[in-house]
Amino acid sequence: MRKILFLLLLIACCTTACGPSKQNRKEAGEIYTTSLNLIKNINQHDSIYVNCVQYLMREIQTPSIQKNKKKLQNLSDSIALLENLNDSLIYIVEKSKTQLNDLQIDKSKYKLFKATDSIFNTYLNVANYEYKNINEKMKTISLPVKDSEYTILLKLSFKADSLLNSAIKYFNNESAEFYEKYGLKEIAK
């Protein structure tokens, strides 16, 4: 009987000792939640920029755009707004990077930091290159837009979308692994 109790006690100790400690799980939960919230905030700003670009892409194709002064003014205002939205996105990403670095100071051992930083860097690169190129192209297009100009805008949009989708896929894979590794499902309850 003593041997059975000893074996059960040994098995119980081994199974609880194999997983991450309570402190590690708590830290992992904080890192996971913070990362998701920072990315959500960045994504909201990015969506505002993308919605403005989509609106412009529809409107610049209107055949009689030159005759409608109000529509021309709206387009001009929206094109000017693109730069402000892009600058806002860059600011939010840089602010998020700072917040992540502050969180990482004493918790650098967690793998999710790398994936989160990677998605931040991708957003910064897209905002600094692809979005700025879109903004510059929008300023110089003829109205209604020529097919060649529209094709360039589509290529830039597609490139930005592809880069972001790749970074998001990488983050999603890493965060799912992180979530499972630290048993964050039980913490969320």
Where are these regions (language model features)?
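Positively charged n-region of N-terminal signal peptides that target proteins for export
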Residues: 1-4
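C-terminal motif of bacterial Sec signal peptides marking the signal peptidase cleavage site
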Residues: 13-17
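Extended amphipathic alpha-helical scaffold segments
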Residues: 49-60, 89-101, 130-134, 171-172
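Second-shell loop/turn segments in exported
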Residues: 74-86, 105, 109, 154-157
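C-terminal partner/receptor-binding element of secreted or periplasmic proteins
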Residues: 164-187
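Short, solvent-exposed, charged loop/turn and helix-capping segments
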Residues: 87, 93-118
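Long, amphipathic, charge-rich alpha-helical segments that form helical bundles/coiled-coils
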Residues: 32-38, 42, 49, 106-161
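Immediate post-signal-peptide N-terminus of mature secreted/exported proteins
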Residues: 18-84, 184-189
